[in-house]
Amino acid sequence: YHERDGLLIPGHCPPDYSGGRIERIDLETGEVEVVATEFEGRPLKGPNDLVFDKAGNLYFTDLGKSYPTHRDTGGVYFMAAGSDKVQELDYNHISPNGIGLSPDEATVYFADTMSARVWAFDLEKPGVAKQATPFSTGRVVAGMPDLRYFDSLAISAAGNVCVATILQGGITTVQPDGQHSHTAFPDPFVTNIAFGGEDMKDAYITLSGTGQLIKCRWPEAGLKLIFNA
């Protein structure tokens, strides 16, 4: 990263980058186990976000990697519970980032950073997406007309997609039908949101440009994660 006008801004892939992977960490012992490093011989570039379903199946995004003059694209992947095999849900998106499941687990949502789009995969079964169009298994739920980047996301109990939004500095809430609204925060680099509290209306939001983690009340309850602490 580098500093600009008091903000911390991430940069390109460093020369000593050793590759992307999914790790399992034992919180009691600190032991680290590498779970996945590739898909069919193709190395993971930068696994970014992940979510589990009720059966313990894992969905995760690979953001890809940026360099000064080019970019490695990323994808969306699946690992069945108890398996070490990585399956590809979809590939060749620009920059898949935040990922979440609808309350009924019938749809996987992910945010593509550079295009500022929320995509959806409607599932035939865990890890298998229906064909949305002749050209893609995914469908675009919403895309933004102005310059902004989408980062991590959380799903509300009502099924809305709450996406941390860079440059516009806030949380963009996208409904399943594509309608969207924006809640602003005083930092252009809002990068993550998570829900908690007894009623799941406490929102924890990262303001990465100024290095802050804030807590605020949210107008709707968040969807409780399967392995919620």
Which residue stretches match the model-derived regions?
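Beta-rich, blade/repeat-based domains predominating
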Residues: 1-15, 39-58, 75, 86-108, ...
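Short, solvent-exposed loop/turn segments at conserved positions within beta-propeller repeat blades
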Residues: 13-20, 64-74, 113-115, 166-167, ...
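A short loop-to-beta-strand structural motif that recurs across blades of beta-propeller domains
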Residues: 20-23, 74-77, 117-119, 170-172, ...
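Hydrophobic alpha-helical segments and helix pairs
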Residues: 22-82
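Beta-propeller fold detector
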Residues: 33-37, 87-91, 130-142, 182-185, ...
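Loop/turn-rich, solvent-exposed surfaces of beta-rich toroidal or solenoidal domains
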Residues: 116-117, 121-125, 135-179
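Short loop/turn segments immediately following beta-strands, especially the blade-tip
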Residues: 120-131, 217-224
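Blade-level signature of beta-propeller repeat domains, shared across WD40, Kelch, NHL, RCC1
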Residues: 191-229
